[in-house]
């Protein structure tokens, strides 16, 4: 039996029939405002509460901002950082400004994937990480889309090899059918897609699991909400032709 890693996000483990299989790399794909970052941070935070060390790789936002945003949901990672259970990899500032005084793990040149992987590997070793979030993986190949699948596979090799279960946040434009980068869907073990659709003049949030190696899962599109405590998914409801139906 494959060991499961519980996301701890209400409704998600039910949809995944018990959680994410250990060592899986999951692409969390969606357009702007769909809740990808919140989902990934909630996954890390719940891991910390379960005693599983975690790493957040910040590519889109200043690490200080990331910590502040997490704290707004009541997810204060600072005590865990001090205990050596949580690490932030700064792949945003390139070590410019004050971050070089505050951040322990800094990627100076994002075009150098080897440096990126080495910094990440060091952080994993130092805290014995079990969960890793890369937000967003799209940033790594935004200027070289042809490299997307290769970069995903290089990262996957390191993460699965160190026993981590990982979420790669992937950005897609509004209305895009793909998952954010050519061939990336073939390089990962799982794909969870978050959507925000306008239905009768109202925006509705939904989640669907496109694939997940090592487990069966719900094949339906489930509605979810973002609250002041994070994401809540409704496994007993389904979004169908713009209407929320009870299962």
From Swiss-Prot:
Keywords: ATP-binding, Nucleotide-binding. GO terms for molecular function: ATP binding; ATP hydrolysis activity. SUPFAM superfamilies: P-loop containing nucleoside triphosphate hydrolases. InterPro entries: AAA+_ATPase, KaiC-like_dom, KaiC_dom, P-loop_NTPase, UPF0273_KaiC-like. Residues 3-247 form the KaiC domain. Gene3D superfamilies: P-loop containing nucleotide triphosphate hydrolases. The keyword ATP-binding applies. It comes from the Archaea. PROSITE patterns: KAIC. PANTHER family: UPF0273 PROTEIN TM_0370. Belongs to the UPF0273 family. This is UPF0273 protein PH0284. It comes from Pyrococcus horikoshii (strain ATCC 700860 / DSM 12428 / JCM 9974 / NBRC 100139 / OT-3).
